[in-house]
Amino acid sequence: MDTSRIDTSRLAVVGERATVVAFEGLGLAAFPVSSADEARRTVSGLIRKREHAVIFITEDVGEKIPDVIAESSRQYFPSVVLVPSSAGSK
């Protein structure tokens, strides 16, 4: 099995613009958000569409949508993972 190439099209990141553009440069689908409502709509939509195997969400955005994060933990796919923002981990 060749593990030297990862299909980054199956990975998404949601967070403030400064963080997601760095991930976008690595080939991930980037979804910059600037409000809790926008984050809720974006993350819920990504989960519902099931087009990405892993959805990374910055910690600061995750704190704004704990209900969506909790709901996502009840299902196997896609995986939702919190990551530090450009300001670092909390």
What are these regions (language model features)?
Residues 53-57:
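Periplasmic-binding protein-like
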Residues 1-2, 26, 50-52:
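Short, surface-exposed connector motifs at secondary-structure boundaries
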Residues 41-48:
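Acidic, metal-coordinating helix/loop segments flanking the phosphotransfer/catalytic sites
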Residues 35, 58-60, 84:
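Short secondary-structure boundary segments
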Residues 4-40:
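N-terminal first-folded block
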Residues 8-9, 51-52, 76-78:
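Short coil/turn connectors at secondary-structure junctions
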Residues 66-90:
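C-terminal structural segments of small proteins and small subunits
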